UniProtKB/Swiss-Prot annotation:
Protein name: Phosphoribosyl-ATP pyrophosphatase
Entry GO terms, CC: cytoplasm
InterPro entries given in the database record: HisE, PRib-ATP_PPHydrolase-like
Organism annotation: Trichlorobacter lovleyi (strain ATCC BAA-1151 / DSM 17278 / SZ) (Geobacter lovleyi)
Gene this protein is translated from: hisE
Pfam families the UniProt entry points to: PRA-PH (PF01503)
Length: 108
C-alpha cells in the first residue's frame, strides 16, 4: 500500500479542524469563513485550470492543478458538512460497474 493513499483523509481532517478557526489563521479557515459561494468560485477556477493544464500544460502543471481541485473540493465538502467518506463510498459503489450501465441506472 502506498503511504500517500491516505493523504486525502488526512487533508480532510485538517480542513475540518480549521472550520472554527480564525479566518486570519490559515487560507483554509479564511475560505471556510467566506462561505460556500466563495468556495464554489474557487472550485470553478481550479476546474478550469485543470482543463487548461490537461489540454496544453505539462504533466507537472496538470498534477499541480488537479491537487488544487481536490483540495478545494474537500473544502466544499467540509463547508457543506458532507464527510469525505461519502465520496469514497460512492466511488467504491461505482468501482467495477460499467460507466454506461451506471449512467443508465441514474436515469431510472
Amino acid at each position: 500500500m502506498n503511504s500517500n493513499q491516505h493523504i486525502l483523509d488526512e487533508l480532510y481532517q485538517v480542513i475540518l479542524s480549521r472550520k472554527g478557526a480564525s479566518p486570519d489563521s490559515s487560507y483554509t479557515a479564511s475560505l471556510l469563513h467566506k462561505g460556500v459561494d466563495k468556495i464554489l468560485k474557487k472550485v470553478g477556477e481550479e476546474a478550469t485550470e485543470v482543463v487548461i493544464a490537461g489540454k496544453g500544460g505539462t504533466d507537472t502543471e496538470l498534477i499541480y492543478e488537479t491537487a488544487d481541485l481536490l483540495y478545494h473540493g474537500l473544502v466544499l465538502l467540509a463547508a457543506r458538512d458532507i464527510p469525505a467518506d461519502a465520496v469514497w463510498s460512492e466511488l467504491q459503489r461505482r468501482f467495477g460497474t460499467s460507466g454506461i450501465v451506471e449512467k443508465a441506472a441514474r436515469k431510472e
